[in-house]
């Protein structure tokens, strides 16, 4: 059966736009130079740029809701392209003494008309479950400006409307700037200009009200105030004084730096790479495992990586090639004589398929349990790979194995998350 190819110009316009949406802006500019008809098609913001935004982000966010639909789609495309690098895990860095409101791991994902940053925290209930607490919202104003709001207290960003105007009036949110220091580095700092502008607007509005009182006195109100020994505008002054006291009492938001966790997922050649969570010392601890340049594996606590000072790794292995089972009788005894540390609801039934020798310079002994590593090298231990892709580790000086589970994403949401994704 013979087939015929239609010229591009004879294809229906909606299909033309879908095909063009697969190109880059530079390629579309080149295509627009081929004819006046295509130049006109590529210049219509409501057609080509709308389809390009929908093609790239339509399944992730509601592109018509951004900036209340009042900015050109060409501007929206450029903005979303810059923001999409935020999606994923980031870790706090460079803090000498991080505040309790600044957990070491955060996660950015798409909202309906904004990007939402959430702190990743343990539920604290003896399970592997984690929870996301929104703390940073990034959107666009109808004028096309970036609008970023930080929740210092918590709980104010769980239910957000598409209209960000309501957030500007909230006393529990702080306007911040999110500065990109590179593809994998951002700095969040308070937007003082926004605060000062709002303060000047309040002063102007209160001044206008004072002028009205002077020009149009209400004598009955005046006598009432004299009888109550109050002065005109006293309530407003008290309110302003309370607002100043609230501003003074609020802890200044110190700039914070975040680095993107680039290698947070495993690969066939690097099965342990990424973010992990383990039940240690009565709570969930987060770990970051990386493969180094010399063929070894390094495991660090995410919390330690947020500090400005150097902290030793939890463990490191000189090699990354696993020793496969069956193991020697000595290694089998070493494995089977240990207690698996995991949440109470978890039952360890994993089969060990591989093993690595590891070392560490830090103490990892459970409270109240002295090390029993007499005759062993300090920090020597084992990493055991399970048949389901997870692993556990333990030191020869004690009798425990800390089983780790991956901090994973399922359909863009955190696995083992106790709350519904927003």
From Swiss-Prot:
Instruction: Please list the residue ranges that the record marks as compositionally biased, kind Basic and acidic residues.
Output: 197-207, 242-252
Q: What positions does the domain F-box occupy?
A: 5-52
Superkingdom assignment: Eukaryota
Ranges for the region named Disordered are 197-216, 226-252
PROSITE patterns per record: FBOX
Q: What is this protein called?
A: F-box protein At3g12350
Q: Which Gene3D superfamilies match?
A: 1.20.1280.50
Transmembrane ranges, per UniProt, are none
Q: Which InterPro entries match?
A: F-box-like_dom_sf, F-box_dom
């Amino acid at each position: 059966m013979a087939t015929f190819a239609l010229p591009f110009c004879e294809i229906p316009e909606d299909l033309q736009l879908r095909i063009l949406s697969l190109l880059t802006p530079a390629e579309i500019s080149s295509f627009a130079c081929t004819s006046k008809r295509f130049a006109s098609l590529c210049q219509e913001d409501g057609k080509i740029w709308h389809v390009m935004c929908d093609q790239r982000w339509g399944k992730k966010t509601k592109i018509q809701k951004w900036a209340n639909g009042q900015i050109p789609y060409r501007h929206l495309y450029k903005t979303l392209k810059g923001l999409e690098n935020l999606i994923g895990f980031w870790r706090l860095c460079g803090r000498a003494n991080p505040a309790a409101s600044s957990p070491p791991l955060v996660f950015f994902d798409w909202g309906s008309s904004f990007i939402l940053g959430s702190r990743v925290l343990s539920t604290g209930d003896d399970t592997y479950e984690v929870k996301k607490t929104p703390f940073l919202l990034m959107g666009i104003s109808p004028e096309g400006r970036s609008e970023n709001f930080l929740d210092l207290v918590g709980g104010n960003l769980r239910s957000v409307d598409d209209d960000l105007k309501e957030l500007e009036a909230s006393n529990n949110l702080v306007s911040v700037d999110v500065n990109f220091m590179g593809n994998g580095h951002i700095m969040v700092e308070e937007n003082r200009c926004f605060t000062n502008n709002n303060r000047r607007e309040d002063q102007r509005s209160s001044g206008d009200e004072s002028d009205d009182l002077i020009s149009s006195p209400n004598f009955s109100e005046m006598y009432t105030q004299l009888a109550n020994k109050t002065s005109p505008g006293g309530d407003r002054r008290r309110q302003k004084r309370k607002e100043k006291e609230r501003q003074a009492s609020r802890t200044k938001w110190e700039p914070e730096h975040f680095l993107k966790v680039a290698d947070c997922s495993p690969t066939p050649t690097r099965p342990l790479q990424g973010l992990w969570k383990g039940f240690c010392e009565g709570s969930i601890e987060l770990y970051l495992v990386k493969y180094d340049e010399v063929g070894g594996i390094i495991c660090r606590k995410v919390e330690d990586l947020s500090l400005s000072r150097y902290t030793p790794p939890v463990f490191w292995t000189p090699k990354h090639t696993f020793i496969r089972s069956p193991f020697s009788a000595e290694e089998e005894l070493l494995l089977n004589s240990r207690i698996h540390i995991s949440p109470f609801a978890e039952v360890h039934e994993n089969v060990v398929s591989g093993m690595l020798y590891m070392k560490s310079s830090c103490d990892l002994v459970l409270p109240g349990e002295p090390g029993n590593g007499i005759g062993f090298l300090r920090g020597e231990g084992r990493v055991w790979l399970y048949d389901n892709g997870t692993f556990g580790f333990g030191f020869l000086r004690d009798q425990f194995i800390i089983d780790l589970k991956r901090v994973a994403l399922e359909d863009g949401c955190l696995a083992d998350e106790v709350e519904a994704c927003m």
